[in-house]
């Protein structure tokens, strides 16, 4: 097997960044396959494909059609440029039918998985179980997909994760650190470097006086007094809201975001790539970078600035909570969508990391 290359399959910019790190850790050559749905194809996806492909032997960027029948007819294109056999296949979105198609059509000696996002942390999510949809099961048989989600989980000999210490889709887990090294040497401004969890803090509106938005008037602060004497105190604060289209209706998502902007007096908005609506009341941040990389660049450019990041259940916020001069706040609205077991699990992880959770009415 020594002469065989490895294959790594990505579906998102974050997965491409993880792929870059995984390839850099190994001497063996890699082929890279990045799959992108047509409606998600944008500069951000293309940028991270270029970043990851620089470390590969061969790279393919394949657009997945929106039309169901075009997708079916185009399945063989997913194999274009790939070898018939690989030493190790690496995949994150093992529930995705396109990823499953490729993994069922090639041969590999070993399989390793890595994080799809926070879905890995939710037992019972689509990354843990086979689809129960009868049409999907029929299509899998027609496509020759024998290995599905549960079978791929069992095959995975290890799982590479951004969230060590948390249960995941396969064991053992191996920590994958994307940003700690990049954050070293950043001006700290009253805090240490990339920090560990500083304890659980959950704010509930019934515990203290609330303002007209139904939330706590006083937000929690990290304890920086002990370090202020040795590090310069930031003179400016930027508040950023991370967009997330979590509600089924675009208008409801926009209204929720605008309410959060107003309630927390947030001046900037970083949209999610899947957003199809426009939010008013804040300056849009337009960047080819994912939020984690954008924030690192901002920390370098603005050594006198402190950043407050507000979000609902964002993977990006989980990834930046330990950045210097950065405070992350998780907001939990009263809507039922934010109290399902899966979402509750993500809020639980955030609390374990020491991210303050603010309940609003």
Where are these regions (language model features)?
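Active-site and donor-binding regions of nucleotide-sugar-utilizing enzymes
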Residues: 7-138, 142, 316-319
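Short, hydrophobic beta-strand segments that form beta-sheet elements in well-ordered domains
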Residues: 8, 89-91, 111-113, 265-272, ...
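Short, charged/polar "capping" segments at the starts of alpha-helices
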Residues: 39-47, 98-99, 121-122, 248-250, ...
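Active-site regions of enzymes building and remodeling cell-envelope glycoconjugates
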Residues: 49-61, 108-111, 129-132, 267, ...
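A nucleotide-sugar donor-handling region in carbohydrate enzymes
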Residues: 114-117, 121-190, 195, 199, ...
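Conserved catalytic-core segment of nucleotide-activated headgroup transferases in glycan assembly
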Residues: 238-275
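Donor nucleotide-activated moiety binding/catalytic core segment of transferases
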Residues: 276-323
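Catalytic binding pocket for nucleotide-activated donors in carbohydrate/polymer assembly enzymes
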Residues: 317-361
């Amino acid at each position: 097997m020594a002469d065989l290359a490895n294959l790594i399959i990505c579906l998102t910019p974050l997965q491409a960044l993880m792929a870059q790190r995984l390839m850099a850790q190994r001497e063996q050559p890699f082929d890279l396959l990045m799959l992108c749905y047509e409606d998600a194809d944008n500069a951000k996806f293309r940028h991270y494909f270029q970043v990851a492909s620089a470390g590969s032997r061969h790279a393919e960027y394949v657009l997945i059609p929106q039309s169901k029948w075009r997708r079916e007819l185009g399945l063989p294109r997913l194999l274009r440029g790939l070898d018939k056999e690989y030493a190790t296949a690496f995949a994150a979105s093992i529930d995705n039918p396109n990823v499953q198609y490729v993994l069922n059509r090639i041969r590999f000696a070993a399989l390793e998985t890595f994080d799809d996002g926070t879905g890995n942390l939710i037992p019972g999510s689509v990354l843990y179980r086979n689809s129960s949809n009868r049409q999907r099961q029929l299509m899998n048989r027609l496509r020759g997909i024998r290995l599905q989600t549960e079978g791929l989980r069992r095959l995975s000999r290890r799982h590479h994760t951004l969230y060590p210490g948390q249960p995941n889709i396969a064991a053992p887990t191996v920590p994958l650190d994307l940003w700690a090294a990049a954050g070293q040497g950043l001006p700290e401004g009253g805090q240490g470097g990339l920090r560990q969890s500083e304890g659980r803090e959950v704010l509930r509106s019934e515990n203290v006086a609330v303002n007209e938005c139904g939330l706590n008037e006083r937000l929690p602060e990290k304890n920086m007094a002990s370090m202020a004497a040795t590090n310069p105190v930031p003179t400016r604060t930027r508040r950023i809201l991370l967009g997330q289209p979590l509600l089924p209706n675009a208008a409801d998502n926009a209204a929720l975001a605008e309410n959060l902007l107003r309630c927390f007096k947030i001046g900037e908005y970083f949209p999610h790539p899947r957003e199809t609506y426009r939010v008013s009341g804040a300056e849009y941040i337009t960047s080819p970078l994912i939020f984690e990389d954008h924030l690192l660049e901002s920390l370098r450019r603005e050594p006198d600035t402190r950043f407050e990041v507000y979000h609902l259940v964002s993977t990006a916020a989980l990834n930046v909570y330990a950045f210097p001069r950065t405070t992350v706040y998780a907001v939990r609205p009263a809507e039922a969508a934010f109290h399902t077991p899966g979402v509750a699990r993500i809020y639980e992880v955030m609390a374990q990391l020491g991210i303050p959770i603010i309940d609003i009415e």
